[in-house]
């Protein structure tokens, strides 16, 4: 019974921890990225235990510069005086009218499939291609031979065959009697 009590306590603690993490609780301060200082404060949770809460930027963020060096423009600084808000321009960017298109890298990229195989790799590839051709040439006759060897095991609907045969014989006689074959030959 004590195991059940321990499990229920663990379940309650885990659900409390999950509820503390869920967004929209309102107990966490709303902060912008990179603002504030890094301070540790103790905050009581619903279960009564105190938890550590970190505020402010992380150490990696402090080590990196927050602003772009002077002379270079970043997206956070906004557009220059001559630019419209939705337009991004710089020394590195060229419009499609002024220079090459962006997808020209595909022309310069060497695809491994296009490289010539040399040595043992080429011989193995050629042998596999030859075996594939041989298989394709022998597959159909082998299937036909297998059918002929085991024809007694294959299903054959004699009634359907006889009906089809008689219908073709009747159609052929009717076309001869009516002279339809002469009309078909003229066209």
UniProtKB/Swiss-Prot annotation:
Write out the entry's keywords from A to Z: Cell cycle, Cytoplasm, Differentiation, Nucleus, Repressor, Transcription, Transcription regulation, Ubl conjugation
Q: Which domain of life is it from?
A: Eukaryota
* Impact after mutating residue 182 to Q: Abolishes RB1 binding
Q: Where is this motif: LXCXE motif?
A: 178-182
Question: Where primarily located?
Answer: nucleus
Q: Where are the compositionally biased (Acidic residues) regions?
A: 52-63, 93-116
What is the tissue specificity?
A: Widely expressed. Most abundantly expressed in heart, skeletal muscle, pancreas, brain and testis. Expressed at much lower levels in placenta and peripheral blood leukocyte. Barely detectable in lung.
**What is a single cellular component term in the Gene Ontology annotation?**
cytoplasmic ribonucleoprotein granule
> Quaternary form?
Interacts via its LXCXE motif with the entire pocket region of RB1. Interacts with EP300, NR0B2 and TRIM27.
Instruction: Report what the protein is called.
Output: EP300-interacting inhibitor of differentiation 1
